[in-house]
Amino acid sequence: MDKIVIRGGKKLKGEIVVSGSKNSALPILFATLLTDDPVMITNVPSLTDIDTAIAFLNFIGKKTVKEGNTVKAYSSYKYKHIAPYDLVRKMRASILIMGPLLVRLKRIEVSLPGGCAIGARPVDIHLAAFKKLGAKISVKGGYVKTSAKNGLKGATISFRVPSVGATENILLTAVLAKGKTIIKNAAREPEIEDLANVLTKMGAKVMGAGTKNIEIEGVDKLHGFMHEVIPDRIEAATYLIAAAITKGGVILKKVIPQHLKSVNDKLKKCGLCIKETKNTISAEWVKNLKPQNVKTEAYPGFPTDVQAQWMSLMCLLNGESCIEENVFENRFLHVSELQRFGADITVNGKTVNIKGVKEFSGAPVMVSDLRAGAALVLAGLAAKGKTVVSRIYHLNRGYDMLEKKLKKLGADIRIIHN
């Protein structure tokens, strides 16, 4: 199993280009199922989740190829209506196959999805919404069987929580359903807006994406598109924290600063010097930073996908801080690994209390999920001595060219291939 070896204590300095957003690229890839016309998607990151999605599309019957950071999808073969466990288990976003295939084939069987082991990420919100649109659903033998023999009809759907995946799935479905669909308490993430922009390019009628209420007027047919995926705000946040935790300075290019407002506001309060232009962010350590409490929330609040990285930083700041996780349960699996570096952390339900320590000592650690892996790499970069990070396949799901980018910033990091 591959490992990352880090010799920490170096200040990271330099410039990097932020990759395209995985969380935007995945639903856009599944949107290609809504048309038989050619499509081209650029700024697609090179990640195992992207490879899995492309393999998935080809299996279903959509000819899809990736060359560099560009994905092209062509006219479809006859689509399969079954998405098997062997493919679905690798990636939670595979649940997004349901909407496009249901609206086009009027039936779909999808194995319950996999992904990171970070607590309950229920699909019941998706299924309840499909029922509102007129689908019949049964769950048997680990598969969700969904059918709509008479087609789908628009409806008003109110989510109990602003689920990103469910919002995307209903967007992908309602654009070809009959009549108007209204999504209330919709997710507001930038990735939702990016998907809506793609659907609009395809000829869909979508209004209100990026707000709590989205309206979709169904159309009869969608056509091809060209689109550049937005930058990855979570990757960008991770490198900003890397500058802070190593007392260095980085310049991020090809980034959208407004997508990182909640993170940047907290970093500024810590004392990190942050400057923004239209598509760049610079972050520089100029003085000892002060800890700041955070509560994770749906966008535009502080992102749950930055919680673990933030924890690594707080562990090394003089003083006490608190992190409250309000989005996912069981998302503190990285705590025990950070304690191996010397972190002073106490878990109390959905809250962690942190007492800053003077320094970390390098240690062997194990990754439990994607963002936990990023937190451990950050800790290793700041620690004295050697850190060995195992189970790095999680990192390959969400960080494009991680080793190369960190080396460019001056990190002593290498991957050992076993």
UniProtKB/Swiss-Prot annotation:
The active site is at residue 116. GO terms for biological process: cell division; cell wall organization; peptidoglycan biosynthetic process; regulation of cell shape; UDP-N-acetylgalactosamine biosynthetic process. Pathway: Cell wall biogenesis; peptidoglycan biosynthesis. Keywords: Cell cycle, Cell division, Cell shape, Cell wall biogenesis/degradation, Cytoplasm, Peptidoglycan synthesis, Pyruvate, Transferase. Its main location: cytoplasm. SUPFAM superfamilies: EPT/RTPC-like (SSF55205). The modification 2-(S-cysteinyl)pyruvic acid O-phosphothioketal is found at residue 116. Pfam families: EPSP_synthase. The keyword Transferase applies. UDP-N-acetyl-alpha-D-glucosamine binds at residues 92, 305, 327. Its EC number is 2.5.1.7. It catalyses: phosphoenolpyruvate + UDP-N-acetyl-alpha-D-glucosamine = UDP-N-acetyl-3-O-(1-carboxyvinyl)-alpha-D-glucosamine + phosphate. GO terms for molecular function: UDP-N-acetylglucosamine 1-carboxyvinyltransferase activity. It comes from the Bacteria. It is an enzyme of class 2 (transferase). Phosphoenolpyruvate binds at residues 22-23. It is found in: Cytoplasm. InterPro entries: Enolpyruvate_Tfrase_dom, Enolpyruvate_Tfrase_sf, MurA_subfamily, RNA3'P_cycl/enolpyr_Trfase_a/b, UDP_GlcNAc_COvinyl_MurA. Belongs to the EPSP synthase family. MurA subfamily. Cell wall formation. Adds enolpyruvyl to UDP-N-acetylglucosamine. PANTHER family: UDP-N-ACETYLGLUCOSAMINE 1-CARBOXYVINYLTRANSFERASE. NCBIfam families: murA (TIGR01072), PRK09369.1 (NF006873). This is UDP-N-acetylglucosamine 1-carboxyvinyltransferase.
